[in-house]
From Swiss-Prot:
Topological domains, Extracellular: 1-554
Function: Critical regulator of mitochondrial DNA (mtDNA) abundance. Binds dsDNA throughout the mitochondrial genome without sequence specificity and controls mtDNA copy number by promoting its replication. Also plays important roles in mitochondrial metabolism and cell proliferation.
Bilayer disposition of the protein: Single-pass type I membrane protein
Entry protein name: Mitochondrial nucleoid-associated protein 1
Annotated source species: Pongo abelii (Sumatran orangutan)
Main location: mitochondrion
Signal peptide: none
Cytoplasmic side, ranges: 572-609
Region listing for Disordered, in residue ranges: 133-163, 406-425
GO annotations of cellular component type: mitochondrial inner membrane; mitochondrial nucleoid
Keywords: Membrane, Mitochondrion, Mitochondrion inner membrane, Mitochondrion nucleoid, Transmembrane, Transmembrane helix
UniProt xrefs under PANTHER family: HYPOTHETICAL LOC287798
Amino acid sequence: MSDNPPRMEVCPYCKKPFKRLKSHLPYCKMVGPTIPTDQKVYQSKPATLPRAKKMKGPIKDLIKAEGKELETENEERNSKLMMDKPEQTVKTFPLPAVGLERATTTKADKDIKNPIQPSFKMLKNTKPKTTFQEETKAQFYTSEKTSPKRELAEDLPKSGESRCNPLEAGASLLVGSIEPSLSNQDRKYSSTLPNDVQTTSGDLKLDKIDPQRQELLVKLLDVPTGDCHISPKNVSDGVKRVRTLLSNERDSKGRDHLSGVPTDVAVTETPEKNTESLILSLKMSSLGKIQVMEKQEKGLTLGVETCGSKGNAEKSMSATGEQEWTVMSHGCENFNTRDSVTEKESQGERPHLSLLIPRETTYEFHSVSQSSSQSLASLATIFLQEKKAEARNHNRVPDVKALMESPEGQLSLEPKSDSQFQASHTGCQSPVCSAQRHTPQSPFTNHAAAAGRKTLRSCVGLEWFPELYPGYLGLGVLPGKPQCWNAMARKPQLNSPQGERLLQVSLLERSSTHIRSLEPPTGLTTSNFSLMRLLGAVQKGWIRCNTTIRKSGFGGITMLSTGYFVLCCSWSFRRLKKLCRPLPWKSTVPPSVGVAKTTGDCRSKTCLD
C-alpha cells in the first residue's frame, strides 16, 4: 500500500490499482474471487454459452414445428389428390417435406435468420400448385413443373407446326384436348425422365430440365413437314376429318381415339384456341390453293390472258404465302375467307373489271381484310380518288371524265360486291393516295357538283397568276379543267408604253400592281419602271426574310413592323411623285439674279423689277 501512489486502491480480486475501486468491484465480482489473472480472458467465453443455448433452443423448436405443419399440409393434400389422380403422381409429393427438413436442420446450426427464409419460399412455391390444378381440368398433375410438356406447349408455335401436313397437325392438336391421352403421356414422360427431375423439392433448378428439353425440341424439329403441294380435295378432306374428330372427342371424353399418335408434338396448353387457329389457317391455305389450281386450269380471260396466266398464278401463290405468314403472326383474327371466295367468283363472272385493277394489288391481299368493315359509300369515294390520282400522275384529267362516262366506269362505280371495292382499295396503298387524303371528300353521287361549285368560287382572283394554273389542275377537284378560265386568263399580256411585255414580272410585283396593270399608266418612264422593279424586288426579298425570321418570336414582330413601314413609305413616295410631277419647281435663287427653269414642255421666267 505504501509503494502505490496516494488515492489508489488495489482490487482484492484482480490485484490492480484503481482510483475508484467501487466502480470496478461489480465487474470483478462476476469473474469470481479465485480466478487468476492469466486465465481471465479464456474463462470469459463459457460465461456467454448459456445465453446462446437459450437463444438456439426456441429457434429449433420453431423450425421443427414448421416442418411438422408442412408435413401435415402435404399429407392432407396427398389425401385429397388420391381421389382425383393416378398413383404415380402421389409419390412425388412427400419429397418436398423431406427436402425441407434437411434444409432447415442443416441451416439451423449455422445461422439464426436463414432457416426461416426457405420455409416461406417453399410455402410460396407449393401453394400455387393447387390453385393451378383447380383452374385447369385437363392438367391436374403435379409433374407439370418438372415434365417438359408445359415448355413444349410454349415453344410449339415457334417450331412451325402449321406448315406441316394438316392431318398430322390436327391429330397432334387433338392430343392436348383429351384427358385420358394426357394421362398416358404423363406416364410416358415419367418413364423417360430421371428421378431427380421428377422431384418437386426446393433445391430443383432449371438446369436439370434443360437437357431433356433440348432433346424434345430436337425431336420436334425432326418431325417431317409433309408435302406442301397438296390437292384441294385432300386438304378439304383433312379439314373435315379434323372437325369430325373434334366433335367426336367433345362428345365422348372418356374414350381414347388417338393411342398411336406420337406424343412428341402434343399440345397441352389452351387446346381450344389452338384448334380454332389451326382450323382457320387450314381453311385459308386450302382456299388459296384451290384458287391457284382453278386459275391454272381456267386462266384469266380477255386482256389478262395477254399478260400471261402463269405470272398471275405465281403472284397469287406469293400472295397466299404472305397470307399464311400474316395469319400465323396475327393469330387469324382479321382474316376473312369469304372475301377471297367472292373475289374469285367476281373475277370469273365479270373478267373485264380486272383490267381496271392495278397489278400491284395481288401483292397486297392481306390489306383487304382491313377494309371489310368499311361502308360502300366510303369505298366508292376511295375508288374515285384512286382514279383521279392515276390521271393526275399522267396529267390527263379529261381521261378520267371519259372513264366516268364510259359504261365500264359506271359498272366499276356501282356497289355490286365487296371484293371489287376491296381490290380497288388495295391500289390506294401507293404514296399518291397519301397526298389525296387532304382533298375534300363527299358522297360520290354529288361529288362532281360540289367540286364544280368550289371551283367557281376559288378561281376568282387567280386569273392573273398563270404560274398557279398547273398546280390548280394538279389538285384534281374536277375531272376536267375549269370553264371560267380562257386562254387570255392563262397568259395575261401586260404591255407597257415602251412596248415590252410584263409576262416575266414576278408574282409579288404583279400582285402589288395588278390594279394599275389593267390600265396602262400615262406618265410611266424608264426611270420610274426601274424604280418599280426595284421596289418589287425589295418586297419579294422582305417576304422571304419575314417567313424565315417569323419563327424567332420578338424579332419576327419587329421585322414585320419595319416591313410595313417600308411598304407604306414606298407607296406614299410613288403617290407623291405622281402628284407633284406636273407642278414647276420653285426657285431658291436670290432676287438679284434671273434664272430660267425648264421642266418638260412647261417654261417659266422670273423677272427683276
